[in-house]
Regions:
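Hydrophobic, small-residue-rich alpha-helical packing segments that form membrane-like cores
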Residues: 155, 163-177, 181-231, 235-237, ...
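Conserved, carboxylate-rich catalytic/transport cores that coordinate ions
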Residues: 223, 606, 704
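M16 family metallopeptidases and their MPP-like homologs
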Residues: 54-56, 61-88, 103-152, 183-209, ...
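Bacterial N-terminal signal peptides
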Residues: 9-19
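Proteolytic maturation boundary segments
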Residues: 24-55, 241-308, 312-313, 319, ...
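Flexible, low-complexity linker/tail segments at the boundary of structured domains
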Residues: 227, 708-709
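Peptidyl-prolyl cis-trans isomerase
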Residues: 108, 156-159, 163-164, 446-450, ...
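Bacterial N-terminal signal peptides that target proteins for export
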Residues: 1-10
Length: 942
């Protein structure tokens, strides 16, 4: 299903995962027994050797193609001498094959604009391995070679001993990178979560001892056994004729054969839990505390009938209402948890279970357990109200309406993911036309009695369960015992609960619109397709109507000011003023009431203080622009002060700050900022527990009011699917009536500057044998569009070199790289950062290799081939971005805050083509100044 009912989260963030058991009486209705159709947009076929294929012609984006090779084989199929080799096989797909020598594949794909990691990628899970290859569809020779790549991945990997042994170092670095509190706690949890099944012993990353010592034949055996046509699918979605795609599939895959005496592809069973048990898992470096209650697993298979689809809608509505109640609890003045969810969730493709989880705040595990279990019991015993059901129906219907509106503007990658799920999980793919029709016909007929019966049938009562507490082991912090966790659940299940009390709320954001202003000036920019308006209160507007999407309008506005206008004593009140105000609601609406009023609306608005700017941003569906504008107006109309919600917000911030302190990265990050900026108090560091008392509610409200009681000097930009003639009266009403009293609209340069010279620091933090090298180069810059491009070209080419040398040649890292930026505000300067995770024993080698590549770039410049790879990728990305509302909005907004010419959006390709090797070399000499940088190295605790 295009929307995957159980995963819809974009508008209300209210859905649970998974599907549900048959609703009572559904099987007796002949119409509901009818099978779901297959979307007419996709051609599904199967070759004689068993290989499945999916073909969907789609022109969003134009001239692009999304290819997937999907293999129903993952770590669950590994033999005892193969732990981690499913994932290792995935790595070897990029290290030599029948038609591409080692490293030749990545180099070739980069040459046609495919970026390694960002575009070209793969993943290995328990039950599948998936290879992702997006590319330009403009040249037929590239298409044929792309299918040749898929062919080699499927059955053409060379897997020679030398290449396998060389890849061990990279895999071990990936293993090292994943180590930490989460990994240590997971190893304790997995046997319990999967109830002793094979899944607990088959984590895709594998085991270090096996990865170091396995024999290459073990890896070749895995590839031979499981990479076979009857376990594979090829997915082709994009700007290609279906007949051409099918021809390419048959040419490259028809000749493949399944192995003789093939091993059966079985699926591991997860035994149901019969007795309740509890587990307390702590770690010194854990970054948060939480509870999980997992009820017995249920075998599951998607029912691909209209009745099955209706049952999924019932579950979606039920999950939305139950989790809406949990969200309400999280926003109480003294919440029992920071956030919680309760739903049927997929554990594996063939199993699901009822899960209750909560992230803990200051109230502790007992209060969280009591609250979530009681809320489940309340729903099971008393069900829901008609108003709750009506709200969640509105939201669901609006979500499907927007998806249907965008049916010809849906990205190919979305369809590719849908067809992957069809192959791997049996998910239905009726197409959005059919889905929207079913939802429109079925949802109105789903009544409260049916929902409440589903709740009684679905929410477990006293079943055998696993209760888990996870969190940091901190001195002075009491921890629960397993017995206490079980006792808390039992007590909550037995406690008397009453029906949910539903409070009436207003039906609209505003009783009546404000007295409108007017439009006093209008100009047209034909070159960029812009209309510029000046309203009667001085507010300016830029309109860019597009046809890139059918149901999307984006908005932003910015002016100078922000946190820079406030003194050091107010810095934390200023930093958190916007989020504090948002946490208390909007004008007269509490956050809970606002969510209810906005049910069925696709609109959101935020107002915030950046370091040097005031920012207003919003998004809406085409029919909800007025709602978005009403929210903008209310943002300027006053602040809702709520001491209880403020204390709830501050409590959550304190918990987050405390938990952050236990993580090795916290000390590392703080040291980097302090070292780079010479301990300047206004440097952009993370919040610490000792900073919390410096936040004052009334001062934060006052700061917000100072900046958002006036719309002076704001220019609002609108990009998307709107009619300028229809939107102008709304702009005059809601933006033209905003107050514009005089306020400061210039930023203040606080004098935050990086240190000069070479400064080196070492940080010792963390239990694992892992290190991180960080280099930061800074300095003044002459900021122009061309100079920013030269800097970006340099960093992207350096990343190619870092992967080629530090990863592939030397095996010192798994990931990491370089990034750079320039800005004119508050002063013209550049920043280039390099981050390279590695092992303590390799720190000196990494530094030596990194500086060798820097020196090579400074003295020799880049290889022309590498520069061409970057430019080709940029030009392809640019052509795609030109068809995106978000890109136009970003360019127009940057032109206002940075003072640049928005017309450069039309000359980007010419500017890119003009960049030469000498330009990049000069950029390296200018921006990689080896006499002016900060080096901070994170090593383990001594």
């Amino acid at each position: 299903m295009l929307l995957r009912i159980a995963r819809i989260t974009t508008i209300a963030a209210f859905l649970a995962t998974a599907f549900l058991a048959p609703a009572s009486g559904a099987d007796t209705d002949p119409a509901l027994d009818a099978p779901l159709p297959l979307s007419p947009q996709v051609k599904v076929g199967k070759l004689a050797n068993g290989l499945s294929y999916y073909i969907h012609q789609n022109r969003k984006p134009e001239h692009k193609l999304e290819l997937r090779l999907v293999v129903k084989a993952g770590s669950i199929l590994e033999d005892e001498d193969q732990l981690g080799l499913a994932h290792f096989t995935e790595h070897m797909a990029f290290n030599g094959s029948r038609h591409f020598r080692k490293h030749e594949l990545i180099s070739y794909l980069q040459s046609i604009g495919v970026k390694f990691g960002a575009d070209l990628n793969a993943y290995t899970s328990f039950d599948e391995t998936v290879y992702v290859l997006p590319l330009s569809a403009e040249r037929s020779e590239d298409l044929d070679r792309a299918f040749l790549v898929l062919q080699d991945w499927a059955q053409g990997l060379t897997l020679n001993d030398a290449d396998i042994d060389k890849e061990r170092d990279i895999i071990l670095e990936e293993l090292r990178l994943g180590k930490g509190a989460g990994d240590r706690m997971q190893k304790v949890l997995m046997p319990k979560i999967y109830n002793g099944s094979r899944y607990a012993r088959r984590l895709p990353i594998g085991q270090e001892e096996t990865l170091r010592r396995f024999k290459p034949d073990a890896l070749r055996r895995f590839y031979r056994d499981w990479y076979r046509p009857d376990l594979m699918a090829v997915v082709v979605v994009g700007d290609i004729a279906p007949a051409k795609a099918e021809q390419l599939i048959k040419r490259h895959f028809d000749g493949m054969q399944n192995p003789a005496n093939e091993r059966p592809r079985t699926y591991a069973a997860i035994p149901p839990r019969t007795d309740s048990e509890a587990l307390v898992v702590t770690d010194k470096e854990a970054g948060s505390a939480g509870i999980l209650i997992r009820y017995p697993v249920q075998a599951f298979q998607d029912r691909q009938t209209i009745g099955g689809y209706r049952e999924q809608l019932v579950e979606t509505l039920f999950s939305g209402m139950l989790n809406g109640r949990l969200q309400e609890l999280s926003q109480l003045p003294s919440p029992p948890f920071m956030g919680a969810s309760s739903a049927l969730g997929r554990l594996t493709p063939r199993y699901r279970s009822w899960n209750v989880s909560a992230s803990l705040g200051t109230s502790g595990p007992a209060a969280a357990i009591d609250a979530v279990v009681q809320e489940n019991e309340r729903a099971r015993r008393f069900g829901f109200s008609a108003t709750e059901l009506e709200r969640v129906k509105k939201t669901l219907m609006r979500t499907y309406e927007r998806a249907w509106n965008e049916r010809d503007k849906t990205d190919s990658s979305v369809y590719a993911a849908e067809y992957m799920r069809h192959f791997l999980e049996g998910e239905s793919v009726p197409g959005i036309d059919a889905e929207y029709r079913y939802v429109s016909e079925l949802v109105p007929g789903i009544g409260l009695d049916e929902i409440n019966a589903y709740a009684r049938r679905t929410i477990p009562d006293n079943s055998g369960k696993l209760v888990v507490y996870t969190g940091p082991a901190q001195a002075g912090t009491p921890l629960p015992t397993g017995e206490q966790l079980l006792a808390a659940v039992t007590a909550a299940e037995r406690r008397e609960v009453g029906a949910h009390a539903e409070k009436a709320v207003a039906s609209a954001l505003m009783d009546k619109p404000p007295a409108p202003g007017g439009i006093v000036a209008e100009t047209r920019d034909e070159r960029l397709g812009l209309t510029r308006l000046t309203l009667s209160n001085g507010v300016k507007v830029i309109l860019k109507p597009t046809t890139f999407r059918n149901d999307q309008v984006l908005m932003s506005a910015a002016r100078f000011g922000g946190q820079s206008l406030f003194d050091d004593k107010d810095m934390f009140s200023a930093r958190y003023a916007d989020t504090i105000v948002a946490a208390m609601g909007l004008k007269d609406f509490s956050p809970l009431d606002l969510r209810k009023v906005l049910a069925g609306k696709a609109a959101a608005v935020s107002a915030g203080l950046g370091n040097n700017t005031d920012i207003v941003a919003g998004t809406a569906g085409a029919s909800d622009v007025e709602t978005m504008l009403q929210m903008v107006w209310l943002k300027f109309a006053g602040v809702r002060r709520d001491e209880g919600l403020y204390q709830s917000y501050i409590g959550k911030q304190m918990e987050l700050a405390r938990n952050r302190q236990s993580q090795p990265g916290a000390l590392f990050g703080d040291t980097m900022v302090a070292t780079l900026y010479g301990n300047n108090p206004r440097a952009p560091r993370a919040l610490r527990p000792e900073d919390i008392p410096r936040i004052d509610l009334d001062r934060a409200i006052d700061i917000y009011r100072q900046r958002f009681s006036s719309a002076k000097d704001l220019t609002f930009i609108f990009v998307g699917s709107f009619d300028p003639a229809a939107i102008k009266p709304l702009l005059a009403t809601y933006l033209g009536s905003l107050p514009t009293p005089d306020i400061p609209t210039a930023y203040r340069d606080l004098g935050v500057r990086p240190v000069k010279g070479v400064v080196r620091r070492e940080v010792n933090s963390g239990l694992e044998d892992k290190s991180t090298v960080a280099l930061t180069f800074t300095g003044p810059a002459e900021v122009t569009e061309m100079e920013e491009l030269r800097l970006s070209a340099m960093t992207e080419i350096m990343n190619i070199r870092i992967i080629d040398v530090l990863r592939e040649k030397l095996g010192l890292i798994y990931g990491g790289g370089m990034e750079g930026s320039m800005t004119r505000v508050p002063y013209a300067h550049y920043t280039v950062g390099v981050t390279l995770p590695t092992g303590p024993e390799n720190v000196d080698k990494v530094l030596k290799a990194a500086f060798a590549e820097i020196e090579r770039m400074r003295t020799q410049g880049p290889d022309q081939a590498d520069l061409d790879k970057v430019k080709t990728n940029w030009l392809q990305t640019y052509r795609k971005s030109l068809q995106e509302n978000s890109y136009w909005l970003a360019v127009l907004q940057t032109s206002l805050t940075e003072g640049t010419d928005p017309g450069t959006i039309l000359s980007f390709d010419r500017e890119v083509r003009s960049i030469g090797v000498a330009d990049v070399k000069r950029a390296a000499q200018r921006y990689l100044n080896t006499e002016n940088y900060v080096q901070v190295v994170l090593n383990p605790e001594k």
